[in-house]
Swiss-Prot record:
Protein name, UniProt field: Polyhomeotic-like protein 3
UniProt cross-references to PANTHER family, sorted A to Z: POLYCOMB GROUP PROTEIN (PTHR12247), POLYHOMEOTIC-LIKE PROTEIN 3 (PTHR12247:SF88)
Residue span of region Disordered: 1-33, 102-127, 224-280, 307-407, 650-690, 825-844, 863-888
This protein's encoding gene: Phc3
Location in chain, cross-link Glycyl lysine isopeptide (Lys-Gly) (interchain with G-Cter in SUMO2): K689, K730, K808
Length: 981
């Protein structure tokens, strides 16, 4: 078993890495075209990338190195197996040479020569289509040197060839390649993880993981899948795909037709495996026809591939086809590994599918590995299938293909993946059945797969219908595939229906191991989970088995979650009517059961055996197939069930039902680690459009002038959140209502008036209300003006007035009150001040006057200042003026007291109003002013009485009396003070 898995792993690694049948044919042969294809810049890029890869700075690099060692071992085994299969792949070699020349090949070590050629082929496909990076990735994964060179190429090329290693290459791919082929990158990442897990041995796992990564990437281009069949075949197929997708598809189908007979005949021989590989590469149809032991699986993958091309536009179709093929190839390599360990969850799928074709386990496995890789590995390996499902998801992302078909294709690869687990049991039990299925695949790919695989059969059938026409007439079908033709083919093939029983028989065996992780995390269709879960578990088991590969896988897995977003990409596919290809005999059952079964998938209640067929088909077709063609959908659904990833892809195709199956697809592909993530992302897909939502999360990584820019999972919000905008608005009415309810005194009219009076104040109040919502209930405030009761949040900052109008009115009323009190007080103040001047001695009187008048004067000054606010204008008097005036009056009185002992006469006059003063009173007043004794006589000479004194100005004094400006100003100031008093 171990030797078989390892050989199978190596084969799968070779297939996935070269996948160009270079390994199958001869690494040297592939290398030559690659070298010829490679340009100086490419070589330099490879060197640079290799240097970067061999750097141990990151754990990813260490994992890559481990993966490289494992891959080299796998390549050695693969090379031996592929050489044995050289005869079968000889047909493709011519094509491979052409493809190598067309595609930019890259020199690499002999073991990685095939890988290199595939990378060159993948490059060609990249040039022709965005998926090329996937091919490069697959090849780079095949061998450490190849992966290093591929990685370098991808680095230099940018998004075209982003492959460093299973983990590193994926990371780089994401960073650099996602820009150009986001879906491809994701698919590659996803496939990487499944491959590792599916590989029975660590080295095999790492190789498988790398192969799967490469396969995913190459699948994106489709070149990889073709090249995987055989170095020549894959090259030819890749070329055809790259050159013209429609033509490529036709060529692939033709090649597969050529090879199918030998392959089916050689069910247990390397030649058969290589042919199966060739078939896979040549075209999905051919895979269905050619594979004898795992031909059902391969045919299924082929069918899927063809479905994609058929439904999708010819160019895009070929691209998708390549992607699907590569995905399936990735899955198949895993299957090859699993065959020996069909019972174990990790490997059970791999050995059986491979052995189904070739009884000899060790011999067949290596061979199968390469064919498996060459043709989509979905059927070949259950773990790989899980990964393949992921890859399928990636493939499905290319929506250019007919919406339903492309999803169907994606699902089919996954279905193939899961079918392989089922097939592993079924194949082991009856390899002849598989061979017969392979033959049937030739006649009817759909039937072939079903007979070969209980569950896979239905997925195969799905593909078969889509690709059946292609299988029958590979060239024509691929060139001019029609979903209806595929549909008829599917329906015509009775095996699909029969397959469910087989599936029920074999899936349960596989399902038990798989369900544990896949089913639980996947909650997808039980059948899909049974196979898909088995794949997932296989991947997990393989990871456990392979420490280095596991580490690598883990890295990819961690990176993979974004690839699982690829499942979302599948949503792009949803338009592709792959579902019609899915046309399944189970159609009737599936259509009716589709909603329920897809729900079952989500519930994980689905029964693995018979339900698998219908539930899988249901889930897959539910969203996509239902829309396009229920029969096909159901068949596709079965594949989807088989591989959760596929179902996810399907769900993108058929938004309506795809959502339910989609989550399962994602989970198996992601494996346990990513399964939870996939579930989260895929659950939304249970509803038709959610898968599209999954696509959006794809993280696009751009490398611009050396800067790696990753796009966020979500766009930055352009407008403010509706929550932010609406909440304050809701709060305000709430606050206002609370205030109105709590404040009974304040009627609504008053509230409205208040707001009208000062809108800014109300805004402030509202803001304060929001800020002090907690305080509102604690205390109530009373307005000092209107007496209204209210919460503090509705009062002004001072918390004294409820509104600004109340504050203003309060100020006006206060100023009026002050003015009235001041006017009422003034006569008393003055009389008091004058009366207090009656001391017996002149000095004592002055002293008394100051002491008495100051306390009274200051308050009056304050009142005057307050009166400035009064609407009525009044003369402004400053404190200094009043003090100076009082001083003058005091001095004048002192003088008069001195001159006139009888001041009793003057005092009454001084106490009277200035307007009634006589000339003598004015003289006495002026004489009392400081420094004005000399001018007092002038006033008398001018006969200025009290009234004239009040009318005097500085000019009068200066002109009429020739007074200096200083004394004139002082006198005028005193006169003004008299006026004010």
């Amino acid at each position: 078993m171990d030797s078989e898995p390892s050989s199978g792993t190596s084969v799968s690694t070779t297939a996935s890495s070269t996948t160009t049948t270079t390994i199958t044919t001869s690494s040297s042969r592939m290398q030559q075209p690659q070298i010829s294809v490679y340009s100086g810049s490419d070589r330099h890029a490879v060197q640079v990338i290799q240097q970067a890869l061999h750097r141990p700075p990151s754990s990813a690099a260490q994992y890559l190195q481990q993966m490289y060692a494992a891959q080299q071992q796998h390549l050695m085994l693969h090379t031996a197996a592929l050489q044995q299969q050289h005869l079968s792949s000889s047909q493709l070699q011519s094509l491979a040479a052409v493809q190598a020349s067309l595609s930019s090949g890259r020199p690499s070590t002999s073991p990685t020569g095939s890988v290199t050629q595939q990378s060159s082929m993948s490059q060609t496909s990249i040039l022709s289509a965005s998926p090329a990076p996937a091919q490069l990735m697959n090849r780079s994964q095949t061998s450490s040197s190849t992966s290093g060179s591929i990685t370098q190429q991808t680095m230099l090329l940018g998004s075209t060839s982003p492959t460093l290693t299973a983990s590193q290459a994926q990371m780089y791919l994401r960073a650099q390649m996602l820009i150009f082929t986001p879906a491809t990158t994701v698919a590659a990442v996803q496939s990487d993880i499944p491959v590792v897990s599916s590989s029975p041995s660590p080295s095999c796992q790492s190789a498988a993981a790398q192969v799967q990564n490469l396969t995913l990437r190459s699948q994106k281009l489709g070149v990889l899948s073709s090249s995987q069949n055989g170095s020549p075949k894959s090259a030819g197929q890749t070329q055809s795909l790259t050159i013209c997708h429609n033509k490529t598809t036709v060529t692939s189908s033709k090649i597969s037709q050529r090879d199918p007979s030998p392959e089916s005949k050689k069910g247990g021989s390397p030649g058969l495996e290589s042919r199966s590989t060739a078939v896979t590469r040549t075209s999905s149809i051919h895979q269905l026809i050619a594979p004898a032991s795992y031909s059902p699986i391969q045919p299924h993958s082929l069918i899927k591939h063809q479905q994609i091309p058929l439904h999708s536009p010819p160019p895009k179709v070929s691209h998708h086809q390549l992607l699907l093929q590569q995905q399936q190839q990735q899955i198949q390599p895993i299957t090859l590994q699993s065959p020996s360990q069909d019972p174990p969850p990790s490997q059970h799928c791999i050995p059986l599918p491979n052995h189904g074709l070739s009884p000899a386990p060790s011999n067949a496995q290596p061979q199968h590995c390469s064919p498996v890789q060459s043709h989509p590995p979905p059927l070949t390996v259950s773990p790989n299938q899980a990964q393949s499902a992921q890859q399928s998801v990636v493939v499905s992302p290319p929506p250019p293909h007919s919406p339903s078909q492309s999803p169907t294709i994606i699902i089919h690869p996954q279905a193939l993946i899961q079918p392989h687990p089922l097939v592993s049991s079924a194949l082991q039990t009856g390899p002849n059945l598989q061979q017969a299925a392979a033959d049937q695949v030739q006649s009817t790919a759909q039937l072939n797969l079903p007979s070969h695989l209980p569950l896979p059969a239905s997925p195969v059938v799905h593909i078969g219908p889509v690709q059946q026409s292609a299988l029958v007439s590979p060239g024509q079908q691929m060139v001019s595939p029609t979903s209806h033709q595929q549909y008829s083919a599917l329906q015509s093939s009775p095996i699909p229906i029969a397959t469910p029983p087989q599936m029920s028989a074999s899936p349960p065996a596989q399902l038990p191991p798989l369900p544990l992780q896949s089913m639980q995390s996947l909650q997808v269709q039980p059948e899909i989970l049974s196979q898909g879960q088995v794949l997932v578990q296989n991947a997990l088991v393989s990871e456990e088995e392979l420490p280095a590969a596991e580490a690598l896988v883990q890295l990819p897995f961690q990176t993979l979650p974004p690839p699982q977003t690829v499942a979302v990409n599948l949503q792009v596919q949803p338009p592709a009517p792959v579902d019609p290809p899915v046309v399944y005999q189970v159609e009737d059952v599936c259509e009716e059961e589709m909603p329920e079964e897809s729900d079952e998938c989500a519930r994980m209640d689905r029964t693995p055996p018979p339900p698998t067929l219908s539930p899988a088909a249901v889930t897959v077709g539910r969203g996509e197939d239902l829309t396009s063609e229920h029969p096909l959908l159901e068949q596709v659904e079965l594949p989807a069930v088989a591989s959760v990833s596929a179902s996810v892809i399907k769900s993108p195709s058929d938004p309506t039902h795809a959502s339910a199956p989609a989550p399962p697809l994602l989970i198996p592909a992601a494996s346990t680690r990513s399964s939870s993530t996939s579930l989260a992302s895929s659950t939304p897909s249970l509803e038709n459009k959610p898968p599209q939502a999954i696509v959006k999360p794809q993280i696009l990584t751009h490398v611009i002038e050396g800067f790696v820019i990753q796009e966020g999972l979500e766009p930055f919000p352009v407008s403010r959140s509706s929550l932010l905008i609406e909440q304050p608005v809701k709060k305000r009415p709430l606050l206002d209502n609370q205030v109105v309810n709590s404040v009974c005194v304040q009627p609504e009219l008053q509230n409205n008036t208040k707001h009208a009076d000062n809108s800014s104040d109300t805004e402030i109040e509202d803001m304060m209300a929001e800020e002090t919502l907690e305080e509102m209930d604690s205390e109530l405030l009373k307005c000092e003006f209107c007496g209204k009761m209210g919460y503090p949040n509705e009062f002004l900052r001072s918390k004294r007035f409820c509104t600004m109008s109340c504050a203003k009115r309060y100020n006006v009323s206060c100023s009026k009150k002050f003015a009235l009190s001041r006017w009422n007080r003034k006569p008393d103040n003055q009389s008091l001040g004058h009366r207090g001047r009656r001391p017996s001695g002149p000095e004592g009187a002055a002293r008394e006057h100051i002491l008495r008048q100051l306390p009274i004067t200051y308050p009056s000054a304050e009142e005057d200042v307050a009166s400035h606010e009064d609407p009525v204008p009044s003369a402004m008097t400053t404190r200094l003026r009043r003090q100076s005036e009082r001083e003058r009056e005091r001095e004048l009185r002192d003088v008069r007291i001195r001159k006139m002992p009888e001041n009793s006469d003057l005092l009454p006059v001084a106490q009277t109003e200035p307007s009634i003063w006589t000339v003598d009173d004015v003289w006495a007043f002026i004489h009392s002013l400081p420094g004005c004794q000399d001018v007092a006589d002038e006033f008398r000479a001018q006969e200025i009485d009290g009234q004239a004194l009040l009318l005097l100005k500085e000019d009068h004094l200066m002109s009429a009396m020739n007074m200096k400006l200083g004394p004139a100003l002082k006198i005028c100031a005193r006169i003004n003070s008299l006026k004010d008093s």
